Amino acid sequence: MDSDILVSRTRTATIAQGATGYLMIDLAALGRNYRKLVSMLAPVRAGAVVKADAYGLGAERVARTLYSEGCRHFFVAQFVEAVRLRPALAHDAQIFVLNGLQPGNEIACAEMGIVPVLNSLAQWRQWSAAARILKRCLPAVLQFDTGMSRLGFPREERRELAAALRDGSNVEILFIMSHLASADDMGSEQNGEQFAEMSRIADEFPGFDISFANSGGVFLGEAYYGVLARPGIALYGGAPNAGEKNPMEPVVSLNVAVVQTRTVPAGAKVGYGGAHVTQRETRLATIAAGYADGLPRCLSDRGAVYFKGVRLPIVGRVSMDSTTVDITALPEGALTFGSLVEVLGRHQTLEDIARDAGTISYEILTGLGDRYDRQYR
């Protein structure tokens, strides 16, 4: 027993003290995914969407890896993300803020060399005013709404914007862009509708480069590329197109420790509300991850984890900090206190978990909690 404790202490010293879940991020696989997209897109440039802390994987580490692969265009959602990322990248890397700026952030943004994506006349006026105050031309990107009804200049604002550009401006437009709402569905009619609307916008605003394709858009064909694509989920190993074979390499794996095992008789109630009742004598394991760690509560009695390739179904409700699984299929003693089970990895993909949870891989990936020890290789 004492030797086991000493081994445990040594192992703890080499990883993270107190962690009971280990999120492995394969930066080499990330680089290979980027190179694959670059090869598909050439000669079109490939940027990288690193918003939400690079989908939960660590924006600084991810961005530096992609920079080393030649990426120079990085997209975040909020200005605060750009502020955090800026010191991690060389000055020739451009950081774009997709949501644009809230009033009062314009001067700081300009002084840090961060580029806002302007989505409305209100944002345009604020950025133009900042340029006047600083007495210099400031760069920006214009985003247009082509049918998603979320962000971007609406149709009714385009005429006034075009007039402002014709009259001369202290804002340098680097390119114009829009976002595809249904690119993950290659057969969606909305893809063609948005393409047609973007073509009309290009006619109204001639002479500007275009950025259009997201991860799914890369696989819709060259017509959707523009001069700069903006892949996100595909970089991190997620499937860019629903229902199609995933061409990307997995980047993330997650293993979680067992806290306790037990054997219960038939008729035992498991978890909050006694929602699961065993039909036979059952061996159970409680693992150290719950909905606070990114295992959605809707996986209750639906999802699973794996141990050496054996599927271990979740039984009862997922709790905040723990989840109980049925280990009866394993030989007795195969899984014990401290053993690690696979939540995400070789036997279970992001898409598998998302399907069981009734959601999308983006939500699963970005929801992986900060109690995991993130290990990079």
UniProtKB/Swiss-Prot annotation:
- Family that this chain belongs to: Belongs to the alanine racemase family.
Query: PANTHER family, per this entry?
Result: ALANINE RACEMASE (PTHR30511), ALANINE RACEMASE, CATABOLIC-RELATED (PTHR30511:SF0)
Q: Catalytic positions?
A: 51, 272
The reaction(s) catalysed by this protein are:
L-alanine = D-alanine
Q: Which NCBIfam families match?
A: alr
Identify which cofactors the protein needs according to its UniProt entry: pyridoxal 5'-phosphate
Please name the SMART domains in this protein's record: Ala_racemase_C
Gene Ontology biological-process entries: D-alanine biosynthetic process
Asked if Isomerase is a keyword of the record, the answer is yes
The intrachain disulfides are: none
Q: Which CDD domains match?
A: PLPDE_III_AR
- The UniProt annotation places substrate binding at 150, 320
Pfam families reported in the protein's UniProt record: Ala_racemase_C, Ala_racemase_N
The record's SUPFAM superfamilies line, in alphabetical order, gives: Alanine racemase C-terminal domain-like (SSF50621), PLP-binding barrel (SSF51419)
Modification N6-(pyridoxal phosphate)lysine occurs at: 51
- Record GO terms (molecular function): alanine racemase activity; pyridoxal phosphate binding
One GO cellular component term of this record is:
cytosol
EC number in record: 5.1.1.1
Question: Enzyme group, top EC level?
Answer: isomerase
The top of its lineage is:
Bacteria, Pseudomonadati, Pseudomonadota, Alphaproteobacteria, Hyphomicrobiales
- Keyword annotations from UniProtKB, A to Z: Isomerase, Plasmid, Pyridoxal phosphate
The protein in question is named Alanine racemase, catabolic
Which top-rank group of organisms is this from? Bacteria
Role this protein plays: Isomerizes L-alanine to D-alanine which is then oxidized to pyruvate by DadA.
